[in-house]
């Protein structure tokens, strides 16, 4: 017997995410409820200058209550391809555009409770976006 969803109910619909509770029947017949964050997916970009320097952003993150350095990233809009998101986000967040793009990874950020699939790109040939 496989795990099966017996019922699902929405807990919260926010701007980007949706939180649902799923009532599951486990392979051993036991019932449990999982809370899942549904996320449309995101991209992360490693922008590399010709000299090898990587562009980092310093941003305040309310979830952890502090500023941190991070690579540019953003949420995939409905109907948007991951690479198109990356090209949009690098301009919005850094003011650069890139001549070459290489996808280096794709992974679920927190598969125990979230559906977010992260697409990671290296961007080279950086020039000002104007």
Show the residue positions of the predicted features:
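Acidic pyrophosphate-coordinating catalytic loop
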Residues: 10-14, 62, 107-118
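Beta-rich strand-turn-strand
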Residues: 80-84, 93-100
């Amino acid at each position: 017997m496989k795990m099966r969803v017996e019922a699902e109910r929405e807990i919260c619909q926010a701007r980007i995410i949706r939180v649902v509770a799923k009532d599951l029947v486990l392979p051993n017949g036991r019932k449990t409820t999982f809370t899942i964050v549904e996320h449309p997916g995101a991209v992360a970009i490693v922008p590399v200058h010709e000299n090898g320097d990587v562009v980092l952003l310093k941003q305040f993150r309310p979830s952890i209550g502090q500023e941190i350095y991070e690579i540019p990233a953003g949420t995939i809009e409905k109907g948007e391809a991951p690479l198109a998101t990356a090209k949009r986000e690098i301009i919005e967040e850094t003011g650069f555009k890139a001549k070459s793009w290489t996808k280096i990874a794709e992974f679920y950020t927190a598969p125990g409770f979230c559906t977010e699939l992260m697409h990671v790109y290296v961007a080279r040939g950086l020039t000002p976006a104007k």
